[in-house]
Design a protein with these regions (language model features):
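C-terminal "cap" of GNAT-fold acetyltransferases
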Residues: 123-149
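A short, internal acetyl-CoA/4′-phosphopantetheine-binding micro-motif in the GNAT/acyltransferase core
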Residues: 69-76, 105-106
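A short helix-loop-beta-strand connector motif used in the catalytic cores of GNAT acetyltransferases and
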Residues: 33-47, 138-141
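Conserved beta-strand in the GNAT
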Residues: 43, 49-58, 62-70
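Short amphipathic alpha-helix that is part of the acyltransferase structural core
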Residues: 1-28, 45, 142-148
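Conserved acetyl-CoA-binding loop-helix of GNAT-fold acetyltransferases
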Residues: 77-90, 102
Length: 149
């Protein structure tokens, strides 16, 4: 079942993100960050267990980011990540967002949705907000991708 996240989901969302972050797949998120951006998150439940999470973060009037896509190890390759991304893209369209971007180590996954690889320089709002806090800044090794809606 796909739904918007609730306050009671925050610790499980953080555990999912931390599991992926510990493998170098994404940046970790603090409990505070997840609470601050809880309304951004969609979650997926299987048999009443939270097995996936993904956020759509609004950056500017015409730009949003899909971030913190995490699926529990045992539930990968079952389409959960794709469902979460589609939910975020539907919301972006509903909100009138014209461009959605992602920073990823898995460009082939996002290319399935029509995302194109771009230079990070086209993402100024992103670079100056989250990237400055990143341990990899300024040597980011993630791939920037954009989808025009």
């Amino acid at each position: 079942m796909m739904r918007k996240a609730k306050v009671g989901d925050v610790r499980t969302i953080q555990r999912l993100i931390e599991a992926s972050a510990s493998n170098g797949e994404m940046l970790p998120r603090s409990l505070s960050e997840i609470y601050d951006h809880l309304r951004d998150f969609y979650i997926c439940e299987v048999d009443r267990s939270l097995v996936g999470a993904c956020a759509l973060h609004i950056c500017w009037e015409d730009l949003a980011e899909i971030r913190s896509l995490a699926v529990s190890q045992g539930e990968r390759q079952k389409g959960i990540g794709s469902k979460l991304v589609r939910a975020c893209l539907r919301e972006a369209k509903r909100l009138g967002i014209r461009k959605v971007f992602v920073l990823t180590y898995r460009p082939s996954f996002f290319q399935k949705f029509g995302f194109d690889i771009v230079d990070k320089a086209v993402l100024p709002h992103k670079i100056w907000s989250d990237c400055l806090k990143c341990v990899k800044f300024p040597d980011c090794d993630e791939i920037a991708m954009i989808l025009q809606l």
